[in-house]
């Protein structure tokens, strides 16, 4: 499923632009934005070894806490079915734009496109900062050194422990708003996509935070004896 995450929305949104024969400026913009999003994510996933058999470090931990049959059910219904369905849902603003091609691309669309690109740039910077830090730490350990910091706390990570997640979610809200602009309504049924995506990232972040707090007592600024007794602070999400 991880391998499909950066590809499926590109296909879905691109198909709506193709169905309009690439004559609709709004759909073309949406397709290009999602293509740029997919290219960034694919590159980042590939350099981490995602296409070479490397596994997200969280999956073994999750499997260890379940019986085999429980994980198989989780894999089928949540990872495969639900997440594939979610990728369809977050792409549906393009369907709204497709159904309302009569409305012209306007200043609001341009503002949202620029906002999406700003968020994409932010996520790219956050990913690169994390990559540079992790690679530097690996080289230092391989040379027999001891890293001064065990996790990143500068750059964008000075303001949030997960700036890449923050920017990622906001991009799909921006795409949703572009769809809204095509119909002239701020609220529509396709809001379910970014809402469910936000909830998915909140759940994923909480799980990641628990693992990090267990591994690094100083993570989050909590003393070791308090781990497990405090809720996650807002810095996990604050931009």
Regions found by a protein language model. Give the residues of each.
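Juxtamembrane helix-capping/reentrant segments at transmembrane boundaries
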Residues: 1-11, 54-78, 146-157
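Hydrophobic alpha-helical transmembrane segments
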Residues: 73-83, 237-238
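A basic- and aromatic-enriched beta-loop-alpha substructure that forms the phosphate/nucleotide-
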Residues: 25-68
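A general boundary/transition motif marking the beginning of the first structured unit of a protein
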Residues: 47-51, 77, 200
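Hydrophobic transmembrane alpha-helices
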Residues: 8-42, 84-129, 134, 138, ...
């Amino acid at each position: 499923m991880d391998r499909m995450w950066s590809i499926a929305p590109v296909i879905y949104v691109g198909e709506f632009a193709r169905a309009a024969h690439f004559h609709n400026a709004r759909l073309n913009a949406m397709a290009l934005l999602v293509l740029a999003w997919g290219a960034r994510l694919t590159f980042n996933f590939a350099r981490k070894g995602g296409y070479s058999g490397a596994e997200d470090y969280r999956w073994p931990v999750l499997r260890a806490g379940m019986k085999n049959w429980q994980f198989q059910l989780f894999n089928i219904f949540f990872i495969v079915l639900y997440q594939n369905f979610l990728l369809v849902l977050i792409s549906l603003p393009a369907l709204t734009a497709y159904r309302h091609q009569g409305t012209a691309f306007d200043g609001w669309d341009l503002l949202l496109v620029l906002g999406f690109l700003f968020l994409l740039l932010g996520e790219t910077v956050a990913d690169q900062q994390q990559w540079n830090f992790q690679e530097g730490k690996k080289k230092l350990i391989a040379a027999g050194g001891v890293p001064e910091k065990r996790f990143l706390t500068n750059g964008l990570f000075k303001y949030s422990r997960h700036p890449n997640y923050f920017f990622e979610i906001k991009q799909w809200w921006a795409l949703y708003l572009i769809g809204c602009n095509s119909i002239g309504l701020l609220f529509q049924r396709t809001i379910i996509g970014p809402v469910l995506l936000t909830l998915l990232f909140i759940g994923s972040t909480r799980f990641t935070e628990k693992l990090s707090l267990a591994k690094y007592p100083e993570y989050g600024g909590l003393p070791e004896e308090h781990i497990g007794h405090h809720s996650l602070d807002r810095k996990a999400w604050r931009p």
